[in-house]
């Protein structure tokens, strides 16, 4: 575990190599469930590049080539500040056909499940026949009737800590960091003052 900064408010728990291992494991777990009707749908922002990385591994290691799409939902800002009480869905951002399809929804972190639950309900109402979920990591705190079908890593962390997945192109490296919520708030407030 690498400590960033000097105030113990942020800890890197998985580096780039570790994230690649988690993605390989996810691909191995997902592969038996992929059919010709399967599409990977990444939740923007970080879920989309994760879906693309997962699709690359499915092709390279398993000879599978599922279509990759994206869906935009917004609940938190990039600094993890709460923007909307309920996740906001931009259904026009969905860029693939979903009627009668098996969808695997992909996002970086499963916490309360509100974002993924709302996405799954929207896609089911839009015609998807079977929906599964995949996450790079998960933590306790689920509030919705949802489960993770595929998870790279599970972390049992205290409620006042936040999991942040660094995923290019939004960050310059791959990694998973734990940050204390006070540090997240401080960074968010500093960003507001800079505007």
Model-inferred region functions:
Residues 1-195:
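PRPP-associated nucleotide enzymes
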